[in-house]
Swiss-Prot record:
Organism superkingdom: Eukaryota
EC number: 1.10.3.2
GO biological process, one term: lignin catabolic process
Keywords: Copper, Disulfide bond, Glycoprotein, Lignin degradation, Metal-binding, Oxidoreductase, Repeat, Secreted, Signal
One Pfam family of this chain: Cu-oxidase_3
The protein's name: Laccase-3
Residues that hold Cu cation 2 according to the record: H87, H130, H428
Binding positions (Cu cation 4): H410, C427, H432
Species of the source: Trametes villosa
């Protein structure tokens, strides 16, 4: 066998397993620059742990996560500072560990580290983590996070739930952000683009007769995906960290930052089947030559690409068909306006900036949390002007966000939920956030200092960052 043939064979065999390496809940996470070519085109990136996607971080319900993030970024053509947001974590009493730059912290600078220390007393399910500084996560800094429930009430529905059953979807760009549109869709870090139809694809292996809990995570910066697996149905049992009553579908649409757990019964003929994630981007749609695809391979099937055809989707997921396994009931009274405070968020776009109630979000030089800790409590005095809203304690809030705005649909993400502190609300299309589509809720500002005592290392972040950036405050 020639060297080139051996290399091709090794690469092909290496693609046969797409299980992610697992770390945590107490760990160190190096943030590094690296040149990678997940779709065959080499480019500079920013990565967690030197891999794309970043390593799977795991823990159990009740764990104390202690993740020391070490900034080893040196590529001056890209951002060399960073922050990490632990997407979906409530961060009760640890608002300072939430991660969005200039909302709850200053960025970590090259050569420094910062310990994110938070507990998950009541949360379980499928989450993820990513940079929350400008557009940095689009350049690679994103990975899955799973909190397992040792007493999962739906464990009887599946046989396998481990690192081999996590599926990540990502848009991929051949140049540093913000150049749109994406060149490729990556599934578990591998994919093809029209210019290289022979790049490796992720292979997810199953054994006939077993039931698998797959955890699907959209780490997208922009597109949403229609996700299907040829010849198989999916029984959804979790959405965004919430257990749902089992609901069977043939396909689903998943937006940026969303997560679903579904059970797949490996009861079809031993063979290879296409996994499809079709983006809503006209230039990259379809499945010609294996783009937007991965492979579901039964043990014992030949090592080759599938020949299955996409079947007609007759039972597509409608989110209104999902119901919580345990329904705590929504707060407030069951009609519009049956709350303590109703807020209408009017979204507009002028061609380059987004506005919420006539204000674009522009990151302040002093984080909102630091402003509050220094005694500025009124939203009218907090920066950025027009983008901070006070929420009183022990109140129910109704948000109204109109549809039909340019660039939609806009998948909005609310950090925190019911805890004192400044919490980001923003569109999770990262390019829209960068263009101002965000606000901050200063919830129970007067109690923030008492409820969220910050560690000494947090106090050092801003002076260190300001010195590195030559900022005078």
């Amino acid at each position: 066998m020639s060297f080139s043939s051996l290399r091709r064979a090794l690469v092909f065999l290496g693609a046969c397993s797409s299980a992610l390496a697992s770390i945590g809940p107490v760990t160190e996470l190096d943030i590094v620059n690296k040149v990678i070519a997940p779709d065959g085109v080499a480019r500079d990136t920013v990565l967690a742990g030197g891999t794309f996607p970043g390593p799977l971080i795991t823990g159990k319900k009740g764990d104390n996560f202690r993740i020391n993030v070490v900034d080893k970024l040196v590529n001056q053509t890209m951002l060399t500072s960073t922050t990490i947001h632990w997407h979906g974590m409530f961060q009760h009493t640890t608002n300072w560990a939430d991660g969005p730059a200039f909302v709850t912290q200053c960025p970590i600078t090259t050569g420094d580290d910062f310990l994110y220390n938070f507990r998950v007393p009541d949360q379980t399910g499928t989450y993820w983590y990513h940079s929350h500084l400008a557009l940095q996560y689009c350049d690679g800094l994103r990975g899955p996070l799973v909190i397992y429930d040792p007493h999962d009430p739906q464990a009887y529905l599946y046989d396998v739930d481990d690192e081999s059953t996590v599926i990540t979807l990502a848009d991929w760009y051949h140049t540093p952000a913000p150049l749109l549109p994406p060149a490729a869709t990556l599934i578990n870090g591998l994919g093809r683009w029209p210019g290289n139809p022979t790049a490796d694809l992720a292979v997810i292996e199953v054994q006939h007769g077993k039931r698998y809990r797959f955890r699907l995570v959209s780490t997208s910066c922009d597109p949403n995906y229609n996700f299907t697996i040829d010849g198989h149905t999916m029984t959804i049992i979790e959405a965004d960290g919430q257990n749902t009553q089992p609901h069977q579908v043939d396909g689903l649409q998943i937006f940026a930052a969303q997560r679903y757990s579904f059970v797949l019964n490996a009861n079809q003929a031993v063979n290879n089947y296409w996994i499809r994630a079709n983006p809503n981007r006209a230039n990259t749609t379809g499945f010609a030559n294996g783009i937007n695809s991965a492979i579901l391979r039964y043990k014992g099937a030949p090592i080759k690409e599938p020949t299955t055809n996409q079947t007609t989707i007759r039972n597509f997921l409608w989110e209104t068909d999902l119901h919580p396994l345990t329904d705590p009931r929504a707060p407030g009274l069951p009609f519009k306006g049956g709350v303590d405070h109703a807020l209408n968020l009017n979204l507009t776009f002028n061609g380059s900036e987004f506005f919420i109630n006539d204000a674009p979000f522009v990151p302040p030089t002093v984080p909102v949390l630091l402003q509050i800790l220094n005694g500025t409590l009124d939203a009218n005095d907090l920066l950025p002007p027009g983008s901070v809203y006070n929420l009183p304690p022990d109140s129910t809030i109704e948000l109204s966000i109109p549809g039909g705005v340019t660039g939609g649909p806009h998948p909005f993400h609310l950090h925190g939920t019911d805890n004192p502190g400044p919490w980001f609300l923003h569109c999770h299309i990262d390019f829209h956030l960068q263009a101002g589509l965000a606000i901050v809720f200063a919830e129970d500002a007067q109690d923030t200092k008492l409820v969220n005592p910050v560690p000494e290392d947090w106090n050092k972040l801003c002076p260190t960052f300001d010195k590195a950036m030559n900022i005078t405050v």
